[in-house]
Regions:
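Conserved catalytic cysteine-centered active-site region
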Residues: 80-88
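Flexible, glycine-rich active-site loops centered on histidine and acidic residues
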Residues: 4-5, 12-31, 93-133
Length: 133
């Protein structure tokens, strides 16, 4: 019996790139609407036949740079795409199971089955402080 394996490719998107100083690059448009940028990037990834896009999340500021909340962002992006997978992060440390299930079920319904969950636990002191722990 032969088995065909297929690699799945996803893009991990961040507003100004993955380097901590990427926001300082002269070509970086700090005034632009991040949703417009992400919509263009995700549509490009879809045209390139990538399987999914991924947005990380933190319940605290990362390097002092604000970020859009991924489930809201992915729900909006679902309306601008047709087949690319939409993966977002949610921590089980500070979210109740029912809430996470409801949020991802909503994204899955809105996107017609394209939702994915990056399940994480949190050990970040800044996140803990935001929850009084």
């Amino acid at each position: 019996m032969s088995s065909t394996k297929q690699m799945h490719i996803a893009a991990f998107l961040m507003r100004h790139g993955h380097h901590v100083a990427a926001w300082r690059h002269p070509d970086t448009d700090l005034a632009s609407n991040p949703f417009t940028l992400f919509r263009e990037q995700v549509q490009s990834a879809e045209r390139a036949c990538l399987d999914a896009v991924f947005f990380a999340d933190s319940l605290a500021l990362t390097n002092g740079i604000p970020a859009l909340e991924p489930l809201t962002l992915l729900s909006a992006l679902a309306a601008s795409t047709s087949h690319i997978g939409l993966i977002g992060t949610a921590t089980t440390t500070y979210n109740e199971p029912y809430t996470v299930a409801r949020q991802f079920a909503s994204l899955d319904l809105i996107s017609e089955g394209r939702a994915g969950w990056n399940l994480v636990t949190s050990d970040n002191a800044a996140e803990a402080a935001n929850f009084g722990r």
